[in-house]
Protein backbone atom coordinates (compact mmCIF):
# COMPACT_ATOMS: atom_id res chain seq x y z
CA UNK A 1 0.00 0.00 0.00
CA UNK A 2 1.69 3.19 -1.24
CA UNK A 3 -0.31 5.77 0.68
CA UNK A 4 0.78 8.43 3.16
CA UNK A 5 2.82 5.60 4.60
CA UNK A 6 3.68 2.17 3.25
CA UNK A 7 2.14 -1.04 4.51
CA UNK A 8 3.45 -4.38 3.27
CA UNK A 9 1.72 -7.68 3.96
CA UNK A 10 2.72 -11.23 3.08
CA UNK A 11 0.61 -14.33 3.64
CA UNK A 12 2.16 -17.25 5.50
CA UNK A 13 0.97 -20.68 6.61
CA UNK A 14 2.26 -20.26 10.17
CA UNK A 15 2.94 -17.43 12.59
CA UNK A 16 6.46 -16.08 12.12
CA UNK A 17 8.51 -15.20 15.19
CA UNK A 18 10.41 -12.05 14.24
CA UNK A 19 10.24 -8.92 16.38
CA UNK A 20 11.39 -6.79 13.46
CA UNK A 21 8.05 -7.42 11.76
CA UNK A 22 4.38 -7.45 12.69
CA UNK A 23 2.77 -10.87 12.62
CA UNK A 24 -0.75 -12.08 13.22
CA UNK A 25 -3.41 -14.54 12.22
CA UNK A 26 -5.05 -13.48 8.95
CA UNK A 27 -8.77 -12.87 8.55
CA UNK A 28 -9.01 -16.04 6.45
CA UNK A 29 -9.02 -19.14 8.68
CA UNK A 30 -5.85 -21.19 8.40
CA UNK A 31 -3.70 -18.31 7.15
CA UNK A 32 -1.32 -15.96 8.93
CA UNK A 33 0.66 -12.97 7.74
CA UNK A 34 3.76 -10.95 8.35
CA UNK A 35 3.67 -7.25 7.67
CA UNK A 36 5.88 -4.19 7.75
CA UNK A 37 5.58 -0.45 7.41
CA UNK A 38 7.46 2.66 6.35
CA UNK A 39 6.13 5.75 8.08
CA UNK A 40 6.88 8.38 5.44
CA UNK A 41 5.99 7.70 1.81
CA UNK A 42 3.18 9.77 0.32
CA UNK A 43 3.47 12.07 3.31
CA UNK A 44 7.10 12.66 2.32
CA UNK A 45 6.19 13.52 -1.28
CA UNK A 46 3.47 15.82 0.07
CA UNK A 47 6.07 17.57 2.25
CA UNK A 48 8.24 18.09 -0.81
CA UNK A 49 5.26 19.48 -2.71
CA UNK A 50 4.34 21.94 0.04
CA UNK A 51 7.86 22.91 1.11
CA UNK A 52 10.29 22.46 -1.78
CA UNK A 53 7.93 22.80 -4.76
CA UNK A 54 5.42 25.48 -3.64
CA UNK A 55 5.38 26.92 -7.15
CA UNK A 56 4.07 23.59 -8.50
CA UNK A 57 1.29 23.64 -5.92
CA UNK A 58 0.43 27.25 -6.72
CA UNK A 59 0.31 26.42 -10.43
CA UNK A 60 -2.14 23.59 -9.73
CA UNK A 61 -4.32 25.82 -7.56
CA UNK A 62 -4.50 28.32 -10.42
CA UNK A 63 -5.83 25.73 -12.84
CA UNK A 64 -2.55 24.21 -13.99
CA UNK A 65 -1.51 20.54 -13.99
CA UNK A 66 -1.40 18.41 -10.88
CA UNK A 67 1.54 19.52 -8.73
CA UNK A 68 2.99 16.03 -8.60
CA UNK A 69 3.12 15.91 -12.40
CA UNK A 70 5.00 19.21 -12.45
CA UNK A 71 7.40 17.92 -9.80
CA UNK A 72 8.28 14.97 -12.02
CA UNK A 73 9.47 17.16 -14.89
CA UNK A 74 13.14 16.44 -15.70
CA UNK A 75 13.34 13.94 -12.85
CA UNK A 76 14.18 11.16 -15.30
CA UNK A 77 17.29 13.16 -16.24
CA UNK A 78 18.67 12.77 -12.72
CA UNK A 79 20.89 9.66 -12.67
CA UNK A 80 20.29 6.63 -10.50
CA UNK A 81 21.62 7.45 -7.05
CA UNK A 82 20.81 11.15 -7.40
CA UNK A 83 24.47 12.06 -7.93
CA UNK A 84 25.44 10.80 -4.49
CA UNK A 85 22.60 12.41 -2.54
CA UNK A 86 21.22 9.95 0.01
CA UNK A 87 18.00 10.36 1.97
CA UNK A 88 17.11 8.53 5.16
CA UNK A 89 13.30 8.72 5.11
CA UNK A 90 12.71 8.83 8.87
CA UNK A 91 10.87 12.16 8.63
CA UNK A 92 8.10 10.88 10.92
CA UNK A 93 10.00 8.35 12.99
CA UNK A 94 10.00 4.83 11.63
CA UNK A 95 7.97 1.69 11.99
CA UNK A 96 9.58 -1.62 11.12
CA UNK A 97 12.23 -2.83 11.44
CA UNK A 98 13.56 -0.27 13.94
CA UNK A 99 10.23 0.73 15.58
CA UNK A 100 11.55 4.10 16.70
CA UNK A 101 9.21 7.13 16.81
CA UNK A 102 12.17 9.38 17.59
CA UNK A 103 14.16 8.48 14.46
CA UNK A 104 14.71 11.46 12.18
CA UNK A 105 15.27 11.98 8.47
CA UNK A 106 18.62 12.83 6.89
CA UNK A 107 19.82 14.31 3.61
CA UNK A 108 23.41 13.08 3.31
CA UNK A 109 25.90 14.27 0.73
CA UNK A 110 24.10 17.49 -0.23
CA UNK A 111 26.27 19.85 -2.28
CA UNK A 112 25.85 23.11 -4.15
CA UNK A 113 25.61 21.10 -7.36
CA UNK A 114 22.40 19.38 -6.28
CA UNK A 115 18.99 20.71 -7.28
CA UNK A 116 15.56 20.17 -5.82
CA UNK A 117 15.05 17.52 -8.50
CA UNK A 118 18.00 15.62 -7.01
CA UNK A 119 16.44 15.94 -3.57
CA UNK A 120 13.06 14.68 -4.74
CA UNK A 121 14.46 11.71 -6.65
CA UNK A 122 16.61 10.84 -3.64
CA UNK A 123 13.45 10.82 -1.50
CA UNK A 124 11.73 8.43 -3.91
CA UNK A 125 14.81 6.21 -3.92
CA UNK A 126 14.95 6.21 -0.12
CA UNK A 127 11.43 4.84 0.16
CA UNK A 128 12.29 2.15 -2.39
CA UNK A 129 15.29 1.10 -0.30
CA UNK A 130 13.09 1.02 2.79
CA UNK A 131 10.73 -1.35 0.96
CA UNK A 132 13.72 -3.48 0.00
CA UNK A 133 14.96 -3.57 3.59
CA UNK A 134 11.60 -4.93 4.74
CA UNK A 135 11.49 -7.36 1.82
CA UNK A 136 14.88 -8.84 2.69
CA UNK A 137 13.72 -9.53 6.25
CA UNK A 138 10.59 -11.26 4.97
CA UNK A 139 12.69 -13.39 2.63
CA UNK A 140 14.72 -14.64 5.60
CA UNK A 141 11.70 -16.76 6.51
CA UNK A 142 11.83 -18.84 3.32
CA UNK A 143 8.64 -17.40 1.89
CA UNK A 144 8.97 -17.00 -1.89
CA UNK A 145 8.31 -13.51 -3.24
CA UNK A 146 8.37 -13.28 -7.02
CA UNK A 147 6.17 -10.24 -7.50
CA UNK A 148 4.99 -7.20 -5.56
CA UNK A 149 1.39 -6.05 -5.91
CA UNK A 150 1.23 -2.32 -5.26
CA UNK A 151 -1.84 -0.16 -4.62
CA UNK A 152 -2.53 3.34 -3.36
CA UNK A 153 -1.96 6.86 -4.64
CA UNK A 154 1.78 6.36 -5.02
CA UNK A 155 1.34 3.84 -7.84
CA UNK A 156 0.26 6.69 -10.13
CA UNK A 157 3.91 7.74 -10.18
CA UNK A 158 5.45 5.58 -12.92
CA UNK A 159 9.04 6.57 -12.14
CA UNK A 160 8.60 5.75 -8.47
CA UNK A 161 7.24 2.31 -9.24
CA UNK A 162 10.11 1.68 -11.65
CA UNK A 163 12.60 2.73 -8.98
CA UNK A 164 11.03 0.27 -6.53
CA UNK A 165 11.22 -2.49 -9.14
CA UNK A 166 14.87 -1.71 -9.85
CA UNK A 167 15.90 -1.54 -6.19
CA UNK A 168 14.06 -4.69 -5.08
CA UNK A 169 14.72 -6.65 -8.25
CA UNK A 170 11.07 -7.68 -8.20
CA UNK A 171 8.33 -7.17 -10.75
CA UNK A 172 5.80 -4.58 -9.59
CA UNK A 173 2.18 -5.04 -10.65
CA UNK A 174 -0.61 -2.54 -10.08
CA UNK A 175 -4.36 -3.03 -10.48
CA UNK A 176 -6.66 -0.98 -12.68
CA UNK A 177 -8.42 0.25 -9.52
CA UNK A 178 -5.54 1.65 -7.49
CA UNK A 179 -7.54 2.44 -4.33
CA UNK A 180 -6.57 -0.96 -3.06
CA UNK A 181 -7.33 -0.93 0.67
CA UNK A 182 -10.99 0.08 0.50
CA UNK A 183 -11.63 -2.04 -2.61
CA UNK A 184 -10.00 -5.04 -0.96
CA UNK A 185 -12.01 -4.47 2.22
CA UNK A 186 -15.21 -4.47 0.17
CA UNK A 187 -14.26 -7.73 -1.53
CA UNK A 188 -13.37 -9.36 1.78
CA UNK A 189 -16.63 -8.22 3.35
CA UNK A 190 -18.62 -9.60 0.41
CA UNK A 191 -16.82 -12.92 0.76
CA UNK A 192 -17.36 -12.94 4.52
CA UNK A 193 -21.14 -12.65 4.21
CA UNK A 194 -21.16 -15.09 1.26
CA UNK A 195 -22.58 -12.49 -1.09
CA UNK A 196 -23.63 -14.05 -4.39
CA UNK A 197 -20.63 -14.45 -6.66
CA UNK A 198 -18.13 -13.60 -3.91
CA UNK A 199 -18.38 -16.72 -1.76
CA UNK A 200 -14.91 -18.08 -2.52
CA UNK A 201 -11.97 -16.16 -1.09
CA UNK A 202 -9.64 -17.79 -3.63
CA UNK A 203 -11.65 -16.35 -6.51
CA UNK A 204 -11.68 -12.75 -5.31
CA UNK A 205 -8.73 -12.05 -7.58
CA UNK A 206 -11.10 -12.54 -10.53
CA UNK A 207 -12.56 -9.14 -9.66
CA UNK A 208 -9.18 -7.38 -9.70
CA UNK A 209 -8.39 -6.15 -13.18
CA UNK A 210 -4.70 -5.72 -14.05
CA UNK A 211 -3.18 -2.30 -14.49
CA UNK A 212 0.51 -1.66 -15.17
CA UNK A 213 3.55 -3.87 -14.70
CA UNK A 214 7.07 -2.62 -14.03
CA UNK A 215 9.99 -4.94 -14.76
CA UNK A 216 13.25 -4.44 -12.85
CA UNK A 217 16.33 -3.11 -14.57
CA UNK A 218 19.72 -4.18 -13.34
CA UNK A 219 21.40 -1.40 -11.36
CA UNK A 220 24.68 -1.02 -9.57
Where are these regions (language model features)?
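Phosphate-binding/catalytic loop of phosphoryl-transfer enzymes
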Residues: 1-9
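Glycine/Thr-rich phosphate-binding loops that ligate phosphate moieties of nucleotide
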Residues: 10-220
